[in-house]
């Protein structure tokens, strides 16, 4: 699946708090133990956007979207696109 991070970032930011909680629950039900998703835009470089993921195994370690396993990233994309 192809993606544009700006589109995914915007779509995620538009989710309500309840939808974000539902998204996490849906991913967890698929065995993806994400406890937090952080949408981040660099203040000193406007337009550069990232999504960081925090997993239950080490909830203090932020993993950028581009370092995720491709299968996990595909499932996350599909889940976000459902909203």
Residue ranges and their predicted role:
Residues 80-83:
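Short acidic DE-rich linear segments
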Residues 26-77:
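Acidic, low-complexity, intrinsically disordered interaction modules
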Residues 2-25:
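Negatively charged, low-complexity tracts enriched in Asp/Glu with abundant Ser/Thr
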């Amino acid at each position: 699946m192809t993606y544009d991070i700006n589109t995914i970032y915007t779509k995620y930011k538009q989710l309500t708090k309840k939808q974000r909680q539902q998204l996490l629950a849906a991913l967890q039900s698929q065995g993806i133990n994400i406890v937090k998703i952080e949408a981040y835009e660099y203040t000193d470089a406007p337009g550069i956007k990232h999504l960081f993921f925090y997993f239950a195994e080490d909830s203090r370690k932020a993993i950028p979207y581009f370092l995720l396993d491709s299968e996990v990233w595909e499932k996350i994309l599909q889940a976000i696109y459902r909203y």
